Design a protein with these regions (language model features):
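Transmembrane alpha-helices and adjacent helix-loop boundaries
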Residues: 1-229
């Protein structure tokens, strides 16, 4: 037991921060950076796509649904591979692996965000849209100022689940050797070789704590909102 704890203690800085002192974040730090970056791209992107699908319908909605179904029907690991090889061809240069994975996560997650937010918009009474128009609001203003705030409040639990999934999906970055938590845990295991159980139990516990922390923060927010309401 002491030896198992010692291998974690000896490699804790590397598991948490990677080579941050050398300007190369890794481990838990890189996992969080990729998750936050993908969230900052996927959330507004998904909301904007939901707004387009709700506002215009018809061909626009069908094309957006087709895009979302294609993305959601493909394993994320293939999306990462595609961008890994496609982006250098489009940009004419190599992108950092963490950037490529972050973009893949954002692209993949935006499809789920779009569906969730659109469901929230469609659940609102149609009379609200008509009433806002009679008050002089333009359609875009009605969507932005009246409907979206309500829809986002209603789908917050769904969005939290989506972003917890995103946080766990950062572990797929190991496939292109991005040094996030799963990758550095594998590196430590390959170097030490005799304590894999301790290393990967620790890794799983870190993911569990990160996801539980996000869930608890969201629950407290929901509780405060319900109390205030």
């Amino acid at each position: 037991m002491n030896a198992n704890l010692a291998v974690i203690a000896d490699n804790l800085d590397y598991l948490l921060w990677g080579r941050l002192a050398e300007g190369q974040p890794g481990g838990v730090a890189l996992t969080l950076l990729m998750a936050i970056g993908a969230t900052l791209l996927a959330l507004p992107g998904g909301i904007a796509l939901a707004g387009l699908a709700w506002r215009y319908g018809g061909l626009t909605r069908r094309l957006l649904f087709l895009w979302a179904e294609i993305i959601r029907g493909i394993p994320l690991i293939f999306v990462i591979f595609w961008l890994w090889y496609l982006l250098p061809m489009l940009t004419g240069g190599d992108l950092p692996g963490a950037v490529t994975v972050t973009l893949a996560l954002a692209w993949f997650t935006a499809a789920s965000v779009m569906h969730s937010v659109l469901a929230g918009l469609q659940s609102l009474p149609k009379g609200q849209y008509e009433a806002a128009l009679t008050q002089g609001f333009a359609p875009g203003q009605t969507l932005r100022l009246v409907l979206l705030p309500q829809a986002l409040r209603n789908v917050q639990p769904s969005l939290v689940g989506i972003f917890i999934g995103l946080l766990k999906d950062t572990s797929l970055a190991f496939i292109v050797n991005v040094p996030e938590l799963t990758t550095v845990a594998g590196q430590v295991n390959n170097r030490v070789q005799i304590y894999p159980l301790a290393i990967f139990i620790f890794t799983g516990a870190v993911y569990y704590l990160l996801c539980c922390g996000l869930s608890l923060l969201a629950s407290r927010r929901f509780t405060r909102r319900a109390t205030a309401g």
